């Protein structure tokens, strides 16, 4: 059970970041060997079954290319202050998981662009290596040539301006920088991503037809699979943009209600009776909430001896949401609620290290639902 959350088999770590081969990677390895192996066998009949060993070596070189691409993202992400959680090479090439507050367009663009640049460097290194390998080392030259082509293609393809490709993140950052709106950047890059997805399938089908050839079924199906992945990623970016625009309509102040702060050792009779009370431990860490209704239910002579800790409802870890001001939108609150999950009912809002009040998840949802409803124009 300890390994249940792992995305695959761990290769090692990079500056503390675990690097995995995803569980879907063997699928792409089998596809590559099944397609590249016969091509090698046709070109070099003397190799026999060794052609498939050459194809297997190519899958390892392809894996190194993917890891290099994702490692570039991870290293620059760490440099820009991102918390990088893992690197995974999987069916879709690979991905780097990290946590960030989308601090700036520059950070987003830098993290995005270095992945394709890493592939471009590998392609250039391979091209230079071709000139150093003797002509009679045909298999070595074949492998190096395949690495050059693959990395060159990946570098160019990933720079196409559409989500979820790296070029899409660069486009997103540019629009974000020009408009000051991350939602606008995501929306533009998301729709461009859908154009790229459709164009990719069209290119796979139309290009052979222009040459007077019949499109190969395998490559058409593969392009449809890749385009489907691109379409879903682009759709996610569009949905995120729309959500961001919705969140921007509601300010933290709109859903915030006041709350008093009290140590968990305080007597209940000494607590404010008409407002919520946030209970903190001896270190000042908030861990519970007492609603006015709970104080009223416990009212009576015995209340004089009841401690706040006995009445407080324990809150789940992650219930504290930090914001720079109560005048910002509720994006940080929504993220905090999503991170905690369904168990949370309240968020404690903290500004500059000081509690500012409480936000009920129900009130947050109601405010967003109200903001989403179109307003009727005055008659």
Regions found by a protein language model. Name each.
Residues 1-379:
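Hydrophobic transmembrane alpha-helices and their immediate loop junctions
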